[in-house]
Amino acid sequence: MTNANVDATPLTTKPSQDGFYMPAEWAAQQAVWMIWPYRPDNWRSAGAYAQATFAKVADAIGGATPVYMGVPKAFLAEAQKVMPSHVTLVEMDSNDCWARDTGPTVVVNDNGECRGVDWGFNAWGGHNGGLYFPWDKDEQVAQQMLKQHGFARYSAPLILEGGSIHVDGEGTCMTSAECLLNANRNPELTKEQIEDLLRDYLNVKQFIWLQDGVYMDETDGHIDNMCCFARPGEVILHWTDDETDPQYPRSKAALDVLQNTVDAQGRKLKIHLLPQPGPLYCTEEESLGVTEGTGVPRTAGERLAGSYVNFLITNNRIVFPMLDPATDDIAAQKLQEIFPEYEIIGVPAREILLGGGNIHCITQQIPSGK
């Protein structure tokens, strides 16, 4: 499939005015988007290892949901060799491959219609701690995805990555202050103004603010690496029992918030604790495979922000990252207990983690709307 013409004319209304809202991830999905990894200054061996891992993730998702892969023209032939045949390749320019953060948030209404929210994007901080420059192609990704599906587009006046929000589909939005209130995202806006915009564009009513995300998360603490909804009234929190670990105070503070809050429906939350893998660190061999560029350096000995919470719910499957042989089986068992009606599929995902994220970060679901 070739690059679709981008519709430059956004709607002048807001989703909440039009009766549209962001559904929960467990709502039925018509597709999942991914983007081809190729940056040599972020992915070792010019992305070769990551590409093989992305193919395994796409294969795991494809058993439940159609997969679209955005690929720059120069890499289409290579992607055809690597990707499973069921993956639909779409010619698309991008600066990197984080579909969760550069793709649209698709909102739905009660009639089953879909539209998309196109957020502002500045590569996780712009010139104040951002992860690479330029990001001009990434700014066009959401429009291209929406055009591919023929969805109308809302243009939101807010710098926001999809990985920084989770919703329960019933009026609750969960996020982190470390990211959304960071001075390198929307310094001109107050917390209240940000909440108002999220009400407008997600059609949510209540917010659960955790202070911090996962230790050493270079996105400034995205919620999707730290905590997510399992179903209405239930959340899953990244956890360690080791009080000497720098992650412990972050997870403990989050637990305190979650234990003392209610969702938009007035429910107290049931909290599941998902164990932390590792700790995990970048090796010398892994760091040497990354070339110098505008991306953040990958340094040997640097702690990686590994988390099993960074999984994707897609129709009848949970696709989660396998990160540590010592804890992978424990994580899989815990996820099966939380999601007894789902098929739990693990994919070895260290190569994604080395680039700064994981399975949830590299995917963006398109709800069915039905």
UniProtKB/Swiss-Prot annotation:
Matches recorded under InterPro entries: Agmatine_deiminase, Peptidyl-Arg-deiminase_porph
Pfam families: PAD_porph
Coiled coil segments of this chain: none
Domain of life the protein comes from: Bacteria
Enzyme class: hydrolase
Sorted UniProt keywords: Hydrolase
Catalytic residues, chain numbering: C361 (amidino-cysteine intermediate)
Molecular-function GO terms, alphabetical: agmatine deiminase activity; protein-arginine deiminase activity
UniProt GO BP: putrescine biosynthetic process
Protein EC: 3.5.3.12
SUPFAM superfamilies per UniProt: Pentein
Position of the signal peptide: none
Reaction catalyzed: agmatine + H2O = N-carbamoylputrescine + NH4(+)
UniProt-listed HAMAP family: Agmatine_deimin (MF_01841)
Family (UniProt): Belongs to the agmatine deiminase family.
The name this protein goes by in its record: Putative agmatine deiminase
Species name: Shewanella baltica (strain OS155 / ATCC BAA-1091)
